[in-house]
């Protein structure tokens, strides 16, 4: 069994923005992308996800731009698709040809944009608390425009640029990389995003975590078990 000790905790320059990341464990690379208002520590370390996966994988968890210990650019143009670009630049920085990707909530949106734009760099995707995020989702435009002030968790620019992470039905149908979805049965995104995605891609397994909402799903033991199983079953 590989050691789960911290191998590396560093930062690199991603197109002019500092990106903080940590690596734990050894083995096949798995990149963890956290959700909105969170960080790698809050989304993955605190619930024990990193520790569990690091028993078997080389776990690479970054703080998205605008979050955690990473840089916080002020311009809207520095978010959206550039957040997916950070993953590619991180992989290049670490000399990774490809990797498995796990994204939760906003991280799932980034993961989907990544697999649409760079399928050759992604071996498989696990979407947690997220499914089909569209640029034309009802209320999204108002939600973005209503966020005009920065806060301690994330710059307003990140919120205003969220629609740039949307993917179309045609793009979803064209994905040939294996995808698995994991979501809590009390998560409102189950019906808003996950069910529509499953309708588009019934070949993508959907695992429902009982008694879990959006914020606490990653803390559930069943989430971690389903995540490990999803990574294992999607191996070539």
Which stretches of residues belong to each language-model region?
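Conserved hydrolase catalytic core segment
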Residues: 97-134
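Conserved loop-alpha-helix segment in the C-terminal half of the alpha/beta-hydrolase fold
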Residues: 51, 185-210
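Short beta-strand/loop motif that positions the catalytic acidic residue
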Residues: 175, 181-183
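Active-site nucleophile elbow and catalytic-triad environment of alpha/beta-hydrolase enzymes
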Residues: 155-171, 189
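Active-site loop/oxyanion-hole signature of alpha/beta-hydrolase fold enzymes
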Residues: 51, 61-100
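N-terminal cap/lid segment of alpha/beta-hydrolase-fold proteins
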Residues: 5-18
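Conserved HGGG/HGGXW glycine-rich cap/lid loop of the alpha/beta-hydrolase fold
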Residues: 17-69
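Catalytic histidine-centered segment of alpha/beta-hydrolase-like enzymes
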Residues: 212-222
């Amino acid at each position: 069994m590989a050691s789960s000790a911290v191998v590396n905790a560093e930062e690199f320059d991603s197109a002019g923005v500092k990106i903080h990341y940590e690596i734990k464990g050894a083995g096949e690379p798995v990149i963890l992308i956290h959700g909105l208002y969170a960080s790698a520590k809050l989304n993955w370390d605190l619930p024990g996800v990193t520790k569990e996966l690091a028993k078997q994988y080389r776990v690479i968890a970054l703080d998205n731009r605008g979050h955690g210990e990473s840089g916080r650019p002020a311009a809207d143009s520095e978010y959206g698709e550039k957040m997916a670009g950070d993953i590619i630049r991180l992989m290049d920085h670490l000399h990774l040809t490809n990797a498995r990707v796990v994204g939760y909530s906003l991280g799932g949106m980034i993961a989907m944009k990544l697999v649409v734009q760079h399928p050759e760099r992604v071996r498989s995707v696990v979407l947690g608390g997220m499914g089909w995020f569209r640029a034309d989702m009802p209320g999204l435009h108002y939600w973005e425009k209503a966020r005009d002030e920065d806060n301690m968790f994330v710059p307003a620019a990140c919120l205003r640029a969220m629609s740039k992470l949307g993917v179309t039905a045609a793009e979803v149908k064209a994905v040939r990389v294996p995808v698995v979805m994991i979501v809590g049965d009390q998560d409102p995104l189950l019906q808003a995003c996950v069910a529509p995605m499953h309708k588009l891609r019934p070949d993508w397994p959907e695992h429902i975590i009982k008694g879990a909402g959006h914020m606490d799903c990653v803390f559930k033991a069943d989430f971690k078990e389903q995540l490990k199983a999803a990574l294992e079953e999607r191996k070539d």
